[in-house]
Every structure is written in C-alpha cells, then in structure tokens.
UniProtKB/Swiss-Prot annotation:
HAMAP family given in the database record: GreA_GreB
Record GO biological process: regulation of DNA-templated transcription elongation
Family: Belongs to the GreA/GreB family.
NCBIfam families hit by this protein: greA, PRK00226.1-2, PRK00226.1-4, PRK00226.1-5
Gene: greA
Name under which the protein is recorded: Transcription elongation factor GreA
UniProtKB keywords: Coiled coil, DNA-binding, Transcription, Transcription regulation
Chain segments annotated as coiled-coil in the UniProt record: 47-73
Job of this protein: Necessary for efficient RNA polymerase transcription elongation past template-encoded arresting sites. The arresting sites in DNA have the property of trapping a certain fraction of elongating RNA polymerases that pass through, resulting in locked ternary complexes. Cleavage of the nascent transcript by cleavage factors such as GreA or GreB allows the resumption of elongation from the new 3'terminus. GreA releases sequences of 2 to 3 nucleotides.
GO MF terms held by the record: DNA binding; RNA polymerase binding
Domain of life: Bacteria
Organism of derivation: Thermodesulfovibrio yellowstonii (strain ATCC 51303 / DSM 11347 / YP87)
Length: 158
C-alpha cells in the first residue's frame, strides 16, 4: 500500500491529534485498567479484564491505522492551487438546474469525507464530476436513484 492519500492540512492535523490522544492518554489508561483488572484474580472469569483487553486491541489497531494513513498522507494546501478550476480542497457552490436548490461541496480526501457536513471525497462520483470544471459549467452526475444536473456558481479555496 504505497498509494498516497491526499489530505487537507486540517484533515492531517485532526488525524495527528487523534493519534496523539490515543498514544498519550488512551493507551496508558487502558494499560492501567488491565493491571487493575488483573489484580482482581482469576482471569478466566474476569469480565473487567476481558473488556479492557478488547478495548486495548481496538486502540492498538486504531493507532496502527492512523500511523499508516499519516505515513501515506500527501498534504495539499488548497490556497496554493489554481483557483479558476475546481480542484482538491475547493469549496464549490452549485445550483441544481432541476430544483434551483443551492448546495455547497467541499472537496477533500477520502479519509476526510463527511457528507452530512458537505465534505465529499474527490474520488466520489460528485467529486470526480466537479474536478477541473469552472464557474458556469454544468455537470451531470448519475446516481442509482436519480440523475443530478448542477451548474457551478462559485469556487473558493479557504
């Protein structure tokens, strides 16, 4: 897995903060919880011990996952991108040609995507359709249930 993961500076920092929290706070706390549970005696019927070990396994797995993502991260500063076209990190305002409803999409890397907050992956159908387009251009996005027709009304990089 040598594929680079595009990421905004904010997304990179968010993952770093989570990793730091897991290593500096969560890991020591679970080690302490395991030691305390172990002190209660028979481990075969010690629910606290087994729960703590399970949580430790989850934490260690997440630490490894975050370390791998951060190692493969390619941080892209949107402010240094050609701002005439939709690109990674752009906030794109569109109008649905059929319903005249306005929407805003923030194009981010796959690990930062959060559809509920308008952050869509550049690898999603919407992201792929918008990349490289300019204000005034129209895009058609075919979804399983419906086809969307958007016109780009603004592009910004913040």
């Amino acid at each position: 897995m040598t594929d680079r993961i595009p990421m905004t500076p904010e997304g990179y920092e968010k993952l770093k903060e989570e990793l730091d929290r897991l290593i500096k706070i969560e890991r020591p706390a679970i080690i302490k919880a395991i030691a305390e549970a172990r002190a209660h005696g028979d481990l075969s019927e010690n629910a606290e011990y087994h729960a703590a070990r399970e949580k430790q396994s989850f934490i260690e797995g997440r630490i490894q996952e975050l370390q791998a993502k951060l190692a493969r991260a390619y941080v892209i500063d949107p402010s240094k991108i050609n701002q005439n076209k939709v690109a990674f990190g752009a906030k794109v305002r569109v109008i649905d040609i059929d319903t005249e409803e306005e929407k805003e999409f923030h194009l981010v890397g796959p690990d930062e995507a959060d559809v509920k907050n308008g952050k869509i992956s550049i690898t999603s159908p919407v992201g792929k359709a918008l990349i490289g387009k300019e204000v005034g251009e129209q895009v058609t996005i075919k979804a399983p249930a419906k086809t969307f027709n958007y016109e780009i009304i603004s592009i910004s990089f913040e």
